[in-house]
Amino acid sequence: MADLPPLREVIARHGLDARKSLGQHFLFDLNLTGRIARAAGDLTVGSVIEIGPGPGGLTRALLDAGARQVIAIERDDRAIAIQNEIAEAYPGRLEIMAADAMTVDAAELGEVPRRIVANLPYNISTALLLGWLRRADAFERLVLMFQKEVVDRLAAPPRSEHYGRLSVITQWRCEVRPLFNVDRRAFTPPPAVTSTVVDLIPRAEPLAPARFETLERVTAAAFGQRRKMLRSSLKSLGGAEDLLERTGILPTARAEEIPVEGFCALARALDARTLDGHQSA
């Protein structure tokens, strides 16, 4: 464990006040950062990618847990200066990328097994996740902190209040394991809601065959009007009744009733119909 000053002292010295525009909420509790790092498993091989490390509490915990290589992606110059100090204390183990995480292909960083471990900026958390799910096979696991309501959606089963597009796409590519809640008072500044750490384990194969882009289209249409019957909500895809007949799904069913495999069947039917149309043209 490196001899580094307390986080609050580091923040004061660098003037690192949390910026709402960057979705920053800093975590100072070393017990919590250590717990998150341990949840990621054996870090002594491969690479760990951290998004928005801020003052570096989780960065330190990952390195103290034995991480062979941490790649920290940060766009805030003040935080980058702090990360450089941490890198000096852990020679050769911390790489800092001065970049916007939304523009970085994390699936191409570091070495396998590749993990993402992060207290995500809340304002871009779901957008980041959807990007990583497109390349889910590039990661061994993702241990992430979101607002609790987001994790409720990730883990929600069909016919439940929180089941939606994000549930379908995430569960299609990953096993979803909510780990523990983090009280809002653990952060500076405290967010408005409770947070939850979740462990996402990419599946060796998706839950059912489908193309990512098509599954996105189908779920966006279905859950865009979630209270309507599918024969109405899928009209924007054209030929809703035909799609439902091809998949054996009742036209009177609603999106929240359909399991992940059912949405995959709809995506395959949509692609098959598109292919049939091209071949007959």
Curated annotation (Swiss-Prot):
Its EC number is 2.1.1.182. S-adenosyl-L-methionine binds at residues 25, 27, 52, 74, 100, 119. It is found in: Cytoplasm. One of its GO terms (molecular function) is 16S rRNA (adenine(1518)-N(6)/adenine(1519)-N(6))-dimethyltransferase activity. It catalyses: adenosine(1518)/adenosine(1519) in 16S rRNA + 4 S-adenosyl-L-methionine = N(6)-dimethyladenosine(1518)/N(6)-dimethyladenosine(1519) in 16S rRNA + 4 S-adenosyl-L-homocysteine + 4 H(+). Keywords: Cytoplasm, Methyltransferase, RNA-binding, rRNA processing, S-adenosyl-L-methionine, Transferase. It comes from the Bacteria. InterPro entries: KsgA/Erm (IPR001737), rRNA_Ade_diMease-like_C (IPR023165), rRNA_Ade_Mease_Trfase_CS (IPR020596), rRNA_Ade_methylase_Trfase_N (IPR020598), rRNA_adenine_dimethylase (IPR011530), SAM-dependent_MTases_sf (IPR029063). Its main location: cytoplasm. The keyword Transferase applies. One of its GO terms (cellular component) is cytosol. Specifically dimethylates two adjacent adenosines (A1518 and A1519) in the loop of a conserved hairpin near the 3'-end of 16S rRNA in the 30S particle. May play a critical role in biogenesis of 30S subunits. Belongs to the class I-like SAM-binding methyltransferase superfamily. rRNA adenine N(6)-methyltransferase family. RsmA subfamily. HAMAP family: 16SrRNA_methyltr_A (MF_00607). This is Ribosomal RNA small subunit methyltransferase A. It comes from Paramagnetospirillum magneticum (strain ATCC 700264 / AMB-1) (Magnetospirillum magneticum).
